[in-house]
Amino acid sequence: ATALDVSEKALKIAEENIKNLGLSKKVKVLKSDLFENVDEKFDLIVSNPPYIPLSEKATIQKEVTFDPELALFTKDAKGLEFYEKIIKEAKNYLNKNGYLLFEMGIDQSKEIKELLETNGYKNIEIIKDLAEIDRVAIAQI
C-alpha cells in the first residue's frame, strides 16, 4: 500500500500511525501533490480531498476548523477542484477494473457522479453517512 499527502505534517502523523499499527513493512509513505510523484498502479485509490469552498470558511462549524486549511478548502466556488483532477488522473493509476473511492461534501454528489460518468467510470455508487447525507463516492474504471 502507498499513503501520500502534500503536507509534511500529515505524512509524519501517518508514519507514526503506520508504525504504531505494525504496518511499516506494508505501507510506503510518499510526499506527492495528487499523483505528481506516483509511478505505480493500484487496485484501489482512496482519497479525502479538500472540498469546502474558501468562500464558506466563515460559516462552517467550529469543529471543522481544527483541521489544517490545506486539508479543508478549495479555491473554486463549488469545491470540486480536486475531484476534477483526481477523477481525470486516477484512470492512469488504476489497474483494470480498479476502484476510486472518496469522501465528498454536502450537495456535491450530483456533480461528482456526472464527472465520474463523463470520464468513463462505471458501477458508480453514492453512500450516505449517518445523517443521511451523500458522503462517499465509489466508482470503477
Identify the role of each PLM range:
Residues 22, 65-67, 132:
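Short, solvent-exposed coil/turn segments
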Residues 51-82:
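Mobile active-site "lid"/loop adjacent to the S-adenosyl-L-methionine
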Residues 1-57, 85:
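Conserved SAM/SAH cofactor-binding pocket of Class I
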Residues 77-140:
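Conserved Class I SAM-dependent methyltransferase catalytic core
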